[in-house]
Amino acid sequence: MRVTLATIAWMVSFVSNYSHTANILPDIENEDFIKDCVRIHNKFRSEVKPTASDMLYMTWDPALAQIAKAWASNCQFSHNTRLKPPHKLHPNFTSLGENIWTGSVPIFSVSSAITNWYDEIQDYDFKTRICKKVCGHYTQVVWADSYKVGCAVQFCPKVSGFDALSNGAHFICNYGPGGNYPTWPYKRGATCSACPNNDKCLDNLCVNRQRDQVKRYYSVVYPGWPIYPRNRYTSLFLIVNSVILILSVIITILVQHKYPNLVLLD
C-alpha cells in the first residue's frame, strides 16, 4: 500500500506542477497584465532619442489581444501570415504589426519582454536607418502611428521553430496600424510639435480622448482558426498524463496483489 500511495502522490504532484506552471501566466482580461503592456510601451515611446515630434499615445485594443491570443495558442515561433492584405483580421486596421518573445516561464514578465524588443535600439542608427542585426521589434514598439496594442501570453510545452525550449512562455503583441515600412519610425523634433490637430501633449506623447478610447468589438472574424483554440500540445500532454496516472495506479495495485511481500527500499 505504501508503494501505491507513493506512486499516486508522485503522479498527482507531477500533473499538478504542470497545471500550476500553465496557470501562472495572465490572461488577456487580466487588468495588471493590460496596464503593464500599455504602460511599458508608452514609457519607451516617450523616451526615444532623438526625441519624437509625432509619437502617439498607445492604448489597449481587445480585438488585437484576441488576435494575439489566437495566434499564440498555436505555439509557433513565426509571424501570423494574415496580418496584412488581402486578409483583414481587425475591423479598423487593414495592416497589423506583430512582435514575438519566447522564453522560459520563470524569466517571463511583460517588462522584460518589451525591454528585450526595445534594446534592439543598440543596433539601429536613426540617422541612416541602418540596422546591424535585428531591429524590427524596436521600430515597431516606437512606430509613431501605431496607437493601439493588444498582447497575449501562452504556455507552450513545445514551440515549433524553437525546439530547444520546453514549457515556455510565448508572448505576442499586435499593433494597429502596423509599422515597419521603409521609412523612419517617427519624426525627429521637439516633443509633440507635430501632433495631429486637436491632440494634447502628455509625457511627450500625443493624446486624443476619442482616439484613445478602449473599444470592444463583437463581430470580429478570424478566418481559418478559432479565437481561443486550445493548444493541441497542451491537450495531448494532459490526456497522456491522465492515462499514465491511471495505468500506473492499476499496475501498482496488480503487482502488490500478486506479490504481497514485495518491499521497495528508499
UniProtKB/Swiss-Prot annotation:
Organ and tissue specificity: According to PubMed:8973356, it is ubiquitously expressed with high levels in lung and kidney and low levels in heart and liver. Highly expressed in cell lines derived from nervous system tumors arising from glia, low or absent in non-glial-derived nervous system tumor cell lines. Also found in fetal kidney. According to PubMed:7607567 it is expressed only in brain tumor glioblastoma multiforme/astrocytoma and not in other nervous system tumors or normal fetal or adult tissues.
What membrane topology does the annotation report for this chain?
Single-pass membrane protein
For this UniProt record, give its keywords in alphabetical order, as a comma-separated list: Membrane, Signal, Transmembrane, Transmembrane helix
Iron found in the keyword field: no
- Provide one Gene Ontology cellular component: azurophil granule membrane
- Which sequence ranges are marked TM in the entry? 233-255
**Signal peptide coordinates:** 1-21
Family, according to the entry, reads as follows: Belongs to the CRISP family.
Know the name of this protein?
Glioma pathogenesis-related protein 1
Its lineage reads: Eukaryota, Metazoa, Chordata, Craniata, Vertebrata
The coding gene here is GLIPR1
